[in-house]
Amino acid sequence: MRVVKRYSWLWVGLLLFLTASIAMLLLTSNQRPSFTTATWIWNAKLISSQTEEIVSFAKDNQINLIYLHIEPTRVSPQAYRAFIQKANEANIKVEALGGDPNWAYTANRQSIGDLVSWVKAYNQMAKVDEQFSGIHVDIEPYLLPDWKKDQEKVVNQWLKNVDYLITETKKDGKLQVSADLPFWIDTVTVPGDSEKVSNWMLQRLDSITLMAYRNHAMGHNGIVDIVEKTVAAANSAKKASVIVGVNILESSEGSNVSFHEEGTHEMKQQLVILQEELAENPAFAGSAIHDYESWKHATQREEQL
């Protein structure tokens, strides 16, 4: 009887162990993927001589997405291939970055077509681990003089060009399409409709990066305050589609739009608060820091103190 009793306890222990293991497995499988930490590299010439340095900085700061400017006349395809391969080794995705306020005009649609064509031709020639994972545009039509004169006309052409960008990009291949948008884009409506431009973009693009350039996460006019409506509106799609961007580039637009004075430590603290506040939103995908060079210079200044 002692033997039977002893083995019965072993079976009970084994059963408890298996139950706990299955529970942990289910819990792990239900957890959402890690958040995105992105940055912009506008001066693509840097990758020709600083690939190791950039990737090392990215790893140190948990960057897993880079928007890399396309400059075919200054940077060779070989340089792009070498950089993307190194980035992929570090589990960092790279999206092709392009854009100009004038790209909002349908008369300048060819510039969008040229970017898409270049990226597709590049990817066809590159190995899988050397390819761009998507196209990311920064158009900012509100910088045009016409935005104040005839906003409806500009918005109408802008949306047509975004439709064109998506159609051309998605014709073949699996490239993602994303865009930078101002945090206040939810106050602009589609011409002839009551739909918000923010919702229009979210329905069509794979993701958006909201330029929520503030240096505090909480409180009135803080980062959470100015993005939460757009994030909430995107939740119904049940996909991580909204990246929240902050700025560390020195700015003359005001004392609260950049972390240039506060520094990288304070910026990271505020981004932790941002993530904690928005983590339960399915649409919240992570954060982006503008831009790599400014972030790197700020880090170097702090290291010298």
What are these regions (language model features)?
Residues 24-61, 179-183, 249, 287-294:
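Boundary/entry segment of secreted carbohydrate-active catalytic domains
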Residues 44-59, 108-126, 189-201, 265-278:
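Short, acidic/polar
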Residues 50-74, 128-131, 207:
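Catalytic domains of carbohydrate-active enzymes, especially glycoside hydrolases
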Residues 63, 72, 194-224, 292:
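Aromatic- and acid-rich polysaccharide-binding/catalytic face
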Residues 65-100, 149-179:
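Aromatic-lined substrate-binding rim segments of carbohydrate-active enzymes
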Residues 67, 119-155, 285-289:
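Active-site groove signature of glycoside hydrolases
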Residues 95-102, 158-195, 239-250, 288:
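Aromatic-lined carbohydrate-recognition surfaces of secreted/lumenal glycan-active proteins
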Residues 236, 240-305:
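Substrate-binding cleft of secreted/luminal carbohydrate-active enzymes
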